[in-house]
């Protein structure tokens, strides 16, 4: 086993018990979701990272399948000691619905007919993919995820997750993505679809008992693959080098290495992918649009997750300006967002190739855990005029040991603890001021949890009120939450 490798992994399958309702209003029954999971789910189930794959990806994101000659598609990032560290995190990746790598799609058997769906399969959207993933996580008993990450179409899913389930995710990492599909992106997808449906073997999608439209699918892949590269990468890799010859043939056969490469990519793709799935998934990408009434700011207004938006300098399919548009909209909504550009000549595919930069940027973002990541938001507070008896009752009813005392405008005035209440009972104190700690040690939401932990340890206290810049109480953080998180995310 190579250093940092997961070794042999297996794909698992979850069968939904209920129908899956789609954005179009239609429903799919007997839905299967193929997925893989790496690492160990901790006792509190708060170390989950969901990985979302790109257009033609699958659930096999890392490790090796028996007999394979290469690992999963994001093995450079997933495994022990990598940024998606399986010694810290429980990583889940599933094949999208509409796909052909284990999850229900047009090549699956329609339970009503006993035959492959073909074009009777309903059109799906990125939102439908995300909703299916949510069903899987519910099945796994996961009530929240630490982070969701993906590149290209995976990045679209990340953004959709952030909008659809804002209270469910803590951090969101979108690579080489956009908040809506541009006319150019839609145009490339349409040309690819025409390549498929123009193949006589396509037969209106009814080819499952004959031959797949391999010529059309290969051509679609060739078109797509050009958009994944960059001019620089093609010049570096191929230049104008000839393939197996030292002079032009002066005919219409392949002369150049780049031609041979594209044909190879097209042929090999037909061995692992279904033509109808390509039609459906590219259509889902075309429909993707998170703007609301034309406004991206309005469309992203509900996002609560801390966001990392990553672009690639040489990506012309999802150019950096589209990522910057996302960042500006998030900033306008006061979302905590970080923007990074990967310096690379690989083009769009850099999110699959630039191991060093990606591990550094993503690892730094995931390990930069602050108080706001784990503090309790629904903090119970009281004012100074409350009686000790009432304060004790509130603490008992809510199962808490620390009770911040605030002014009329919610500013911190002090704090009392269960130990203070015990002291008041023993000494027969009747007013809160006899036990109130007024010089309160507090924390800020952007404070690192290790600094917060040292503050608690140095002062021998087990919880801190969290205040904003106006000294208003916005949460509380306890040593138990910190100990759990530090244990799961120890710095490397």
Curated annotation (Swiss-Prot):
This is Homoserine O-acetyltransferase. The keyword Membrane does not apply. SMART domains: CBS (SM00116). It comes from the Archaea. Residues 375-432, 436-492 form the CBS domain. Keywords: Acyltransferase, Amino-acid biosynthesis, CBS domain, Cytoplasm, Methionine biosynthesis, Repeat, Transferase. It comes from Methanosalsum zhilinae (strain DSM 4017 / NBRC 107636 / OCM 62 / WeN5). Transfers an acetyl group from acetyl-CoA to L-homoserine, forming acetyl-L-homoserine. Gene3D superfamilies: 1.10.1740.110, alpha/beta hydrolase, CBS-domain. It is found in: Cytoplasm. It catalyses: L-homoserine + acetyl-CoA = O-acetyl-L-homoserine + CoA. GO terms for cellular component: cytoplasm. Substrate binds at residues 221, 349. Pathway: Amino-acid biosynthesis; L-methionine biosynthesis via de novo pathway; O-acetyl-L-homoserine from L-homoserine: step 1/1. Belongs to the AB hydrolase superfamily. MetX family. Homodimer. One of its GO terms (biological process) is methionine biosynthetic process. Pfam families: Abhydrolase_1, CBS. The active site is at residues 152, 315, 348. PANTHER family: HOMOSERINE O-ACETYLTRANSFERASE (PTHR32268:SF11). GO terms for molecular function: homoserine O-acetyltransferase activity.
């Amino acid at each position: 086993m190579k250093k940092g490798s997961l070794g042999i992994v297996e794909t698992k399958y979850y069968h939904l018990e209920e129908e899956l309702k789609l954005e179009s209003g239609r429903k799919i029954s007997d839905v299967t979701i193929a997925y893989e999971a790496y690492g160990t789910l901790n006792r509190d189930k708060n170390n989950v990272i969901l990985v979302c794959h790109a257009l033609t990806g699958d659930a096999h994101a890392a490790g090796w399948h028996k007999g394979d000659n290469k690992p999963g598609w994001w093995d450079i990032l997933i495994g022990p000691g990598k940024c998606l560290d399986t010694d810290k995190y429980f990583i889940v990746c599933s094949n999208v619905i509409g796909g052909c790598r284990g999850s229900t799609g047009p090549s699956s058997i329609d339970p009503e007919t006993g035959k492959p769906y073909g074009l009777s399969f309903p059109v799906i959207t990125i939102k439908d993919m995300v909703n299916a993933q949510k069903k899987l996580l519910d099945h796994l008993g996961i009530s929240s995820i630490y982070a969701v990450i993906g590149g290209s179409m995976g990045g679209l899913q990340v953004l959709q997750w952030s909008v659809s389930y804002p209270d469910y995710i803590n951090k969101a990492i979108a690579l080489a993505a956009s908040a809506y599909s541009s006319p150019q992106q839609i145009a490339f997808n349409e040309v690819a679809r025409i390549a498929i449906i123009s193949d006589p073997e396509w037969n209106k999608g009814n080819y499952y008992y004959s031959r797949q439209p391999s010529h059309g699918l290969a051509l679609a892949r060739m078109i797509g693959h050009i958009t994944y590269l960059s001019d620089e990468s093609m010049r570096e890799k191929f230049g104008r080098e000839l393939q197996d010859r030292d002079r032009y043939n002066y005919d219409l056969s392949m002369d150049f290495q780049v031609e041979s490469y594209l044909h190879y990519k097209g042929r090999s793709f037909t061995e692992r992918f279904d033509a109808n799935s390509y039609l459906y998934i590219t259509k889902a990408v075309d429909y993707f649009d998170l703007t609301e009434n034309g406004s991206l700011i309005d469309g992203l207004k509900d996002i609560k997750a801390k966001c990392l938006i990553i672009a690639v300098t040489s990506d012309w399919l999802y150019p950096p300006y589209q990522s910057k548009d996302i960042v500006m909209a998030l900033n306008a909504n006061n979302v905590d967002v970080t923007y990074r550009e990967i310096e690379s000549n690989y083009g769009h595919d850099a999110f699959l190739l630039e191991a060093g930069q990606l591990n550094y940027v993503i690892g730094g973002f995931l390990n930069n855990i602050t108080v706001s990541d784990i503090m309790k938001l629904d903090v119970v507070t009281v004012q100074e005029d409350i009686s000790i008896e009432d304060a004790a009752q509130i603490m008992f009813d809510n199962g808490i040991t620390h009770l911040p005392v605030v002014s009329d405008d919610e500013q911190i005035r002090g704090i009392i603890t269960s130990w203070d209440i015990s002291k008041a009972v023993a000494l027969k104190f009747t007013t809160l001021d006899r036990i109130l700690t007024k010089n309160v040690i507090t924390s800020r939401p952007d404070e690192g949890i290790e600094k917060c932990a040292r503050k608690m340890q140095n002062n021998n206290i087990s919880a801190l009120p969290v205040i904003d810049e106006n000294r208003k109480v916005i949460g509380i953080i306890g040593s138990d939450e910190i100990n759990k998180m530090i244990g799961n995310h120890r710095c490397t």
